[in-house]
Amino acid sequence: MDKFLIKMPIKHKNNETPEQKPIVKKETPKAAAKQSNKNTPIQAKEKENAQNDTPKQGRAGRSAKPAAKRKNLDTLEVNTEKNTAESENPPKRRSGRLTRSTRSMAEEGTPSPEKVKPEKLPFIKYRGAIKYFTENQDIAASADDVMQWVDKQTDVDVVPMAFDMEWPFSFQTGPGKSSVIQICVDEKCCYVYQLTNLKKLPAALVALINHPKVRLHGVNIKADFRKLQRDFPEVSADALIEKCVDLGVWCNEICETGGRWSLERLANFIAKKAMDKSKKVRMSKWHVIPLDENQLMYAAIDVYIGQVIYRDLEQREKQKLINELQFKEQNGEAAFKAVKGLGETFLSKINEITL
């Protein structure tokens, strides 16, 4: 009977009403935390209300685990601060969507090399002749000489000619009138014609760029022709566009790359050379006579490297056609289409395969 008398208060301890608060003895922090977990829901709620009413309560007061509903209210401010910090410094996540680069790989097979960070390459050095003319009669005589040289190339049907233009630019007034035309038909000689003193282009120069045997090429060359036609109406942009070659587009066709190219990136990718594209020279006063040495070298290098790139792409195209033909003869049309579908460019010879 004594045993039951001793254990009865312990049995009723959990069934106490809020008014029957037991005398709390000093306990260790660990025991106190354990005891707080054994409180009834009503006691826990009253304890939370008491904690919320205490103005000087710190972070320690929120260390105990409250009821689920009350927890959302108590931690609202903390979550708000956390969300604000995350919005200012969002964590890096892996997106399930296709990025631009992965999309190009999925849809086009090979990402554009122009977007790949180029390695350190040697700068282009041009050691050929630069023939510079500023007057109408001198430009006409020079263009006529080039045209006669083209006519003498009887062993070829097409004579490639690198073509580029320069003009001044102002952030206040925009682009100025076409000031310089530079051409290159031989890697050993470049021609620079300054148009500042010309009201019309010489007939010999117009005849040269429209010569049926001449194939003008460059990067974004169609825009240059439209600009030239606006400044000199005697030039027909449509006629020039029909027979010109955009080196960037041609590179994509042969090398099966994608994207838009600049001359500098094409030089990196095809010729393995770097170009010194000085902004000071590029944005200089191209209409002022005479051009200085830096301007002349800048203009000459643009068409010189264009001619080098054209010759390189020309050789790649020929080799590609040979490799494709040999592969078809050895493996058949079905194998060729299968390998082509896997992304093979045939820029280099591949051995016989078994499917």
UniProtKB/Swiss-Prot annotation:
Cited Pfam families: DNA_pol_A_exo1 (PF01612)
Keyword Metal-binding included in the entry's annotation: yes
Basic and acidic residues: bias regions: 13-29, 71-91
SUPFAM superfamilies linked: Ribonuclease H-like (SSF53098)
Electron transport found in the keyword field: no
GO cellular component term of the entry, any: nucleus
Amino acids binding Mg(2+) 2: 164
Domain 3'-5' exonuclease: 154-315
Residues where Mg(2+) 1 binds: 164, 166, 302
A molecular function (GO) term: nucleic acid binding
Modified residues (Phosphoserine): 104, 112
Entry's EC annotation: 3.1.11.-
Compartments in which it is found: Nucleus
Region entry Disordered, spans: 1-119
Function text: Has exonuclease activity on both single-stranded and duplex templates bearing overhangs, but not blunt ended duplex DNA, and cleaves in a 3'-5' direction. Essential for the formation of DNA replication focal centers. Has an important role in maintaining genome stability.
Family: Belongs to the WRNexo family.
Name of this protein: 3'-5' exonuclease
